[in-house]
């Protein structure tokens, strides 16, 4: 459920309405601009509800590491439409590359799942947009239409070849005592573990 931003007049009412909602799995907090927004929202909802931080402003991006590190933060999402209006740029991949990278780095540093990219308005542009999302290291994408789901899920899921390589590499590494043989082993091990983590999250392999 989307919750209005913590500085708005509607935030308190939103939280009150959801505090005792049965079956609530989590909320998306609009225009998150600090870790305190995460804590305040979580506490209003009882302290256990996962919160997805929607980054929609320059201030939010500048504090994204603090936001990601806040315990209630389940994940970060990129509110690309409002964000580009706030900083005054077009939705150009090059113009937004730094911003997307910051979300990826903050998520990884905080040990939370990879960030969720913003939606794509034109269905014809969705496949290329999903490809960009994946290349930037983001692991999810907001959808405007239910018909977007298959394209997004397919485009962001590890391929069978990637999963097979990752499993083989980890098995071989462990069978050799779990010690790197050279400097290239650790980066490849980290990549393999990320692939397997995503595959498990998506139900492609069993835990």
Regions found by a protein language model. Give the residues of each.
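Expand to "…catalyze enediolate/carbanion chemistry for C-C bond making/breaking, isomerization
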Residues: 1-207
């Amino acid at each position: 459920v989307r919750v209005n931003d913590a500085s708005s007049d509607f935030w308190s009412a939103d939280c009150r309405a959801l505090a005792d909602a049965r079956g609530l799995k989590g909320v998306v907090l609009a225009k998150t601009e600090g870790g305190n927004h995460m804590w305040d929202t979580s506490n209003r909802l009882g302290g256990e509800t996962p919160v997805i931080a929607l980054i929609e402003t320059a201030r939010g991006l500048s504090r994204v590491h603090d936001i990601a590190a806040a315990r209630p933060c389940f994940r970060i999402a990129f509110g690309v439409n409002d964000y580009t209006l706030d900083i005054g740029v077009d939705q150009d991949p090059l113009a937004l590359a730094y911003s997307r990278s910051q979300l990826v780095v903050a998520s990884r540093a905080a040990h939370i799942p990879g960030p969720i990219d913003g939606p794509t308005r034109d269905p014809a542009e969705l496949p290329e947009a999903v490809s960009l999302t994946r290349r930037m290291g983001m692991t999810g994408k907001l959808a405007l239409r239910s018909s977007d789901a298959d394209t997004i899920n397919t485009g962001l899921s590890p391929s069978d070849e990637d999963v097979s390589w990752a499993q083989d590499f980890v098995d071989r590494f462990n069978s050799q005592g779990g010690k790197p043989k050279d400097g290239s082993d650790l980066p490849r091990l980290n990549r393999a573990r990320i692939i397997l983590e995503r595959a498990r999250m998506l139900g492609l392999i069993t835990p």
